[in-house]
Swiss-Prot record:
Leader sequence residues: 1-22
UniProt note on tissues of expression: Expressed by the skin glands.
Record organism: Lithobates palustris (Pickerel frog)
A cellular component annotation (GO) from this entry: extracellular region
Pfam entry (one): FSAP_sig_propep
Subcellular location(s) of the protein: Secreted
Function: Antimicrobial activity against the Gram-negative bacterium E.coli, the Gram-positive bacterium S.aureus and the yeast C.albicans.
One GO process term, biological-process aspect: killing of cells of another organism
Disulphide bonds in the chain: C72-C78
Entries under InterPro entries matching the protein: Antimicrobial_frog_2 (IPR012521), Frog_antimicrobial_propeptide (IPR004275)
Family under the similarity heading: Belongs to the frog skin active peptide (FSAP) family. Esculentin subfamily.
Keywords: Amphibian defense peptide, Antibiotic, Antimicrobial, Cleavage on pair of basic residues, Disulfide bond, Fungicide, Secreted, Signal
Propeptide residues according to the Swiss-Prot or TrEMBL record: 23-39
Protein name: Esculentin-2PLa
Amino acid sequence: MFTTKKSMLLLFFLGTISLSLCEEERGADEEEGDGEKLMKRGLFSILKGVGKIALKGLAKNMGKMGLDLVSCKISKEC
C-alpha cells in the first residue's frame, strides 16, 4: 500500500509540473499573439485612412465633373 501511495504521489507531482509548464507556454504564446494583433490592427487603420483620403479626392473630382455637366446642360453648350 505504501508503494501505491508513493507512485500516486509521484504521478501527481509530475502532472502538476507538466501542467504548470503548459500554462507558462500558453501564456507566452498569447503574449506573442497580442503583438501580431496590434500590428494587424495598425496596418488596417493605415489602410482605412488611405482609403478615406482616396475616396474624398474621388468624390471631390466626381462632384466637379457633375457640376460641369449640369452647367453644360443648362447653358446647352454640350
